[in-house]
Structure formats: C-alpha cells, structure tokens
C-alpha cells in the first residue's frame, strides 16, 4: 500500500484550550458556539466533543480500506489544512482550503470535475504568512474521539453502535 498514514484535521472547536476542570462546566450553549464552522446543532456538538472527527476517521478507514493505525486526526485551529496523506516514499500531500462546508460538498457532487467556487475558495497567496501548526488531540480531554477510534479499531457492529449512542447522548445533552 502506498499510503503510510493519513491525518484529518479538527479545529478543536470551542473547547480546544479548555482544561479538564473547564470541561466539567460545559453547557449546551457553550458547545454550540463554534469558533469557525457554522453548522446544525447535532454536528456542532459532535464537533465540540471531537466525536465528528472520530467518526470521520472511521469513514476514512472504510472508504480507503485502511487499518485503524493508519488513520488519525490532529488539531489545527486555523482550519486551513483539512487532511494530510503520508506516502511510503516519505512525501506528504496536504489539502488546503478556506473553512467553507460548500467546498467538500461541491467536490463530492461534481467528482471527478471541480466547480468554480473561487469566492469561497482558498484566496491565500503562497507569499502570505501561513499558520500550519498542528497538535495532538488530548484523548483524555476529548474521550469521544478516543471511543470512536476504538470503535473503528474493533470494526464490526461497533461503529454503528457508536453512532446510535452518540445520537442519544447529543439529544439528551441538548435537552
């Protein structure tokens, strides 16, 4: 296999700089206040807990037929980089774009072509100052990510059970 590892990126959501004590005081209102993305309530909560990133890792494992140890995620607060692929020869490719949900949707709809969405695209010249800083996800601070990774590793019915449990947990949290 040419792919050695892939990383998805997460902004870290509203709690990326929280401590364990801060996390004990989280409310639905705080969780729904995402610093970058504008989304519906369910996906915003999943983004705040990084459950969405864990689920996306499972999706990547299934879509690209990769073992769980070859798929991970990192926090990238600027949301300029959306994924990286490390190849067996040591080279890496990275997808850069603005934080606009229309871009991945348009790419999926138009595949293998691309739609001209320059106004929402990445208007960031190569000579500008880039901030491509990344940090590991704290699995203690974001247990949903760790649980999703484990469900992906176990495979079978575990990912489906995870999705159902997440639906119920988010619904209960928002009450």
How should these model regions be labeled?
Residues 1-175:
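Catalytic, metal-anchored helix/loop core of enzyme active sites in primary metabolism
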């Amino acid at each position: 296999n040419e792919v050695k590892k892939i990383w998805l990126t997460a902004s870290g959501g509203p709690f990326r700089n929280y401590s364990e004590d801060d996390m004990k005081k989280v409310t639905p209102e705080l969780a729904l206040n995402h610093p970058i993305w504008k989304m519906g309530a369910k996906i915003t909560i999943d983004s705040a807990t990084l459950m969405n990133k864990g689920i996306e890792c499972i999706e990547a494992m299934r879509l690209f037929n990769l073992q769980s140890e070859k798929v991970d995620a990192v926090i990238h607060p600027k949301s300029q980089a959306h994924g990286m692929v490390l190849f067996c020869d040591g080279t890496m490719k990275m997808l850069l774009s603005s934080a606009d949900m229309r871009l991945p949707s348009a790419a999926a709809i138009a595949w293998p072509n691309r739609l001209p969405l320059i106004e929402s695209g990445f208007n960031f010249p190569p000579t500008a100052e880039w901030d491509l800083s990344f940090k590991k996800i704290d699995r203690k601070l974001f247990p949903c990510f760790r649980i999703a990774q484990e469900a992906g590793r176990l495979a079978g019915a575990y990912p489906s059970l995870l999705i159902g449990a997440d639906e119920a947990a988010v619904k209960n949290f928002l009450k």
